[in-house]
Amino acid sequence: MKNHFYGLYLGLLILSNLVSSFNSFSQVTAKKCLIVSDIHFDPLFGSHSDTVLRRKLERSSFDEWKKIFESSTAQMTINAGLLFQDANYGVLKSALDNMKVKLPHPAFIIIAGDYIWHRATPADSVLKRKCLQFIALLFKEHFADTPIIPAMGNNDTYGADYILQDRKFFNDFADAWAPNLPKSSGDQLKKQGYYSYETGNLKLMVMNSALLSFGSHYPQAPAMFSWLQTNLSDDKTKNVWIVMHIPPGANVYNGSNFWNVDYTQTFINSVVKYSSKIKLSIASHTHFNDFRVFYDAANDPVAYMRIVPSISSSHGNNPSFEVAEFNSVTCRVIKETNYYLDLAALPKDKGVTHALWETTISLPIGLKLSEISAGDFSKFMDNLKADQSWQLLNDYKKFYTVGTKIDSSIRTNKVNYLKYLKADSLKEK
């Protein structure tokens, strides 16, 4: 009997150690990062006709801006009136404060472009530079020791919207994010406008989508694709995340393409060819939640891209940021959580200065996926098209709009949502 109990005790002890080891391994392999996009901070929020304020901001150092904004009611107020507007200082600060609460020590932070406010012009270059420096300062104050991986968007230029950045912008942009953007990555950015960053066994490749946007014909674009191909074909490269601002594929809002068609197909073919290495692609630009699925020539889903929502609510969307949990060994994303600020639930006639971004949308649960993968996103699209109950459409709608109740028919009409899904399919040729 003694031997029996001793054997049982020994078995339970071994089982307990195995469970403990598994839990420890899970904790070690699971890491989390922040993904942010389309901040569109407006330093002249509510005061674009105020020439005195403009001159004050232009003449002040960017690290003096905080005091200026803190004395401005327009900059500090958070309320329902911010819907369809760029971000004021109140929203930007609230976003960063909530990021720090939700994930105090991220493995890294990805920012997928568009820091500068809409309708900025080349004449605003001084404010643009200080705007970038100010945003970078705030991120570095909140996350002093965290690597920050920023991409450039179409608004991020000293020229007009969508115009390729010049060398001065590359230098200013890289310097603004140093030292959180490591020097080796910053040097690449200064030289060519795109770069890579390695952490553990993951390589992040940050493209400059200004080279690819529809109607552009920049001679530097082929060199960027060559750089991408060279890195992906390297035997030492095992796990890759690709980051950009403007996604490939169709723009359902105006019927055009986001990129030049040839560039789109070149990118699709590269992603399909190296799909075993590319564990995630990230884009933004639309201000809404979405995805793309890459299919090989046999029509099998082999890779996916996530399009992440924005801090700016200029498209009528809720301000949002994401926490992504990933396996540090395989570098595949396990879970995504969008934290958003429900602006419509706030008063219109008065504002708050502190807001909790508590409402969440998550993957894979939000779209009833079994896991976050190309195959599951593809199945979701097939199931939605066949669903007569509209339940999956409602799930997609909530996911796409980040919980915003938008009246605009271009976003809530069923036909248009099916167009979005059609645009989400990218096939090898």
Predicted regions span which residues?
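Active-site glycine-centered loops adjacent to acidic/histidine catalytic or metal-binding residues
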Residues: 38, 113-114, 153, 245, ...
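Bacterial Sec-dependent N-terminal signal peptides
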Residues: 1-27
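His/acidic metal-ligating clusters that form di-metal
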Residues: 101-105, 203-205, 214-303, 320
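Short, solvent-exposed beta-strand-terminating loops
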Residues: 32-63
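Extended active-site neighborhood of metal-dependent phosphoesterases/phosphodiesterases
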Residues: 125-230, 262, 301-305
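Non-catalytic terminal accessory segments
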Residues: 27-31, 104, 331-429
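Active-site-proximal beta-strand elements of phosphoester/diester hydrolases
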Residues: 31-43, 81, 201-212, 243, ...
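Core catalytic region of metal-dependent phosphoesterases/phosphodiesterases
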Residues: 64-70, 78-165
